[in-house]
UniProtKB/Swiss-Prot annotation:
Official protein name in the record: 3-isopropylmalate dehydratase large subunit
Gene: leuC
Binding site for [4Fe-4S] cluster: C336, C396, C399
Free-text comment on the cofactor: Binds 1 [4Fe-4S] cluster per subunit.
UniProt GO MF annotations: 3-isopropylmalate dehydratase activity; 4 iron, 4 sulfur cluster binding; metal ion binding
Family membership: Belongs to the aconitase/IPM isomerase family. LeuC type 1 subfamily.
Function according to Swiss-Prot or TrEMBL: Catalyzes the isomerization between 2-isopropylmalate and 3-isopropylmalate, via the formation of 2-isopropylmaleate.
Keywords annotated in UniProt: 4Fe-4S, Amino-acid biosynthesis, Branched-chain amino acid biosynthesis, Iron, Iron-sulfur, Leucine biosynthesis, Lyase, Metal-binding
Catalytic activity: (2R,3S)-3-isopropylmalate = (2S)-2-isopropylmalate
InterPro entries: 3-IsopropMal_deHydase_lsu (IPR004430), Acnase/IPM_dHydase_lsu_aba_1/3 (IPR015931), Acoase/IPM_deHydtase_lsu_aba (IPR001030), Aconitase_4Fe-4S_BS (IPR018136), Aconitase_4Fe-4S_dom (IPR036008), IPM_dehydratase_rel_enz (IPR050067), IPMI_cat (IPR033941)
Organism: Staphylococcus epidermidis (strain ATCC 35984 / DSM 28319 / BCRC 17069 / CCUG 31568 / BM 3577 / RP62A)
NCBIfam families: leuC, PRK05478.1, PRK12466.1
The protein's annotated pathway: Amino-acid biosynthesis; L-leucine biosynthesis; L-leucine from 3-methyl-2-oxobutanoate: step 2/4
Subunit structure: Heterodimer of LeuC and LeuD.
Length: 456
């Protein structure tokens, strides 16, 4: 019996434990940020422990950082978390991509951009969207603060191996339909828990034809499908992305191992899902979890249970309405899901020569300083600002109500982020998840439109 991609990487990292029982995994890369690391560092101090592998631990500042005046942090808790990480990095010898540094940004942007994220690695971070790195053929997953401390102390974690679920995606994406629409559609069709207990391997011709940035968008939202892990087979697209990046110093010697990272033809999957994207439409969420979404041409569904009723009440919507009926007030282009250069380029095609609708506050937050510099080199900052968008500094920003960037209560926001929970973008904020192109078109038109009609 052959092995899946996930099985191969898992097996290589098992230090102790039997099949079917919790196993001790070696961790190749530990990414940290200011929110989930302070207590873990304090635990080391209390027990007088050293950091086991500071050379495999990298820090960035993202969740709490302001995106307007980055060195003027008014919130006391946010400021404390940021300064604490800066001091902890100094005390324990951790490399930090600090405020204002050339590489600072959202943790799931920084890893790939610097070449830290590589095929075949085990990667952890105290953040639920760590599966983003699985797009490179890595086992990457989010962990809690107690686990962060365990990795600090031992560079290992006890984990129970999940089952394997293959999502085979084929067909050519229509113009105006993107990777974000693929993952939103899957979650809408199969629910927010269909991946629970599984490692999701995304495969098929559609995946092979996607850029690395688009692949990361899909893996980023594996957790919204209930899965701890989401990954893809590394190929020439992957290798070309990694090659030449600062931390990819063992590129040539690693290729032999990387080229073995695929699921064997006779590998067993516990479950298989088939998807043809040929007729896929742009997706829009209407409710308060990512499962509550529709294809653009479809009306919002009938109320089936108390959760639906609560969602409609919170969102101020009702069954039978369509996405174009939503009265938008904010548009947010950003987050670890869709704040990469290709996302901003796609959005720029939509808004070029246009003006943001007078009823809309539109914000662009590049996911990292690297993306910001590259976008500005292309003149995208001027294009967005000329259209009426705010052009901000890198950070998690409006993805979560943990920093100054928040959506006002009761206001509907077209967002390229990954979660539309109650209060996610601020108290009473009403979030609608969409692709960057859909968000850009909404900013110009003041409402959702079928972006397939305007995509360039």
């Amino acid at each position: 019996m052959g092995q899946t991609l996930f099985d191969k990487v898992w097996k290589k990292h098992v230090l102790h434990g039997k099949e079917g029982e919790p196993q001790l995994l070696y961790i190749d890369l530990h990414l940290i940020h200011e929110v989930t690391s302070p207590q873990a560092f304090e635990g080391l101090r209390i027990q007088n422990r050293k950091l086991r592998r500071p050379d495999l631990t990298f820090a960035t500042l993202d969740h709490n950082v302001p995106t307007i005046d980055i060195f003027n942090i008014k919130d006391e808790i946010a400021n404390k978390q940021i300064t604490t990480l800066q001091q902890n990095a100094k005390d324990f010898g951790v490399h930090i991509f600090d405020m204002g540094s050339d590489e600072q940004g959202i943790v799931h942007m920084v890893g790939p951009e610097t070449g830290l994220t590589q095929p075949g690695k085990t990667i952890v971070c105290g953040d639920s969207h760590t599966a983003t790195h699985g797009a490179f053929g890595a086992i990457a997953f989010g962990i809690g603060t107690s686990e962060v401390e365990h990795v600090f102390a031992t560079q290992t974690l006890w984990q129970t191996k999940p089952k394997n679920l293959k999502i085979n995606i084929n067909g050519s994406l229509p113009a105006g339909v993107y990777a974000k629409d693929i993952i939103l559609y899957l979650i809408n069709q199969y629910g927010v828990d269909f991946g629970t207990g599984y490692a999701l391997e995304f495969t098929g011709e559609t995946i092979k034809n996607l850029s690395m940035e688009a692949r990361m968008t899909i893996c980023n939202m594996a957790i919204e499908a209930g899965a701890k892990y989401g990954l893809m087979q590394p190929d020439e697209t992957t290798f070309n992305y990694v090659k030449g990046r600062p931390y990819a110093t063992d590129f040539d010697s690693s290729m032999a191992w990387w080229k073995e990272l695929y699921s064997d033809d006779d590998a067993y999957f516990d479950k298989v899902i088939e998807l043809d994207v040929t007729n896929l439409e742009p997706q829009v969420t209407w409710g308060t979890n990512p499962e509550m979404g529709v294809s653009f041409s479809n009306p919002f569904p009938e109320i089936k249970n108390a959760n639906d009723q609560r969602a409609y009440d919170y969102m101020g919507l009702h069954p039978g309405q369509k996405a174009e009926d939503i009265k938008l007030g904010y548009v947010f282009l950003g987050s670890c899901t869709n704040a990469r250069l290709s996302d901003l380029i796609e959005a720029s095609h939509i808004i070029k020569g246009q003006q943001v609708h007078p009823n809309i506050t539109a914000i662009v937050v590049p996911g990292s300083r690297t993306v910001k510099k590259e976008a500005e080199a292309l003149g995208l900052d001027k294009l967005f600002k000329d259209a009426g968008f705010e052009w901000r500094e890198p950070g998690c920003s409006m993805c979560l109500g943990m920093n100054p960037d928040q959506v006002p209560e009761g206001v509907h926001c077209a967002s390229t982020s990954n979660r539309n929970f109650e209060g996610r973008q601020g108290k009473g904020a009403r979030t609608h998840l969409v692709s960057p192109a859909m968000a850009a078109a909404a900013a110009i038109n003041g409402k959702f439109i079928d972006v397939r009609k305007v995509v360039v």
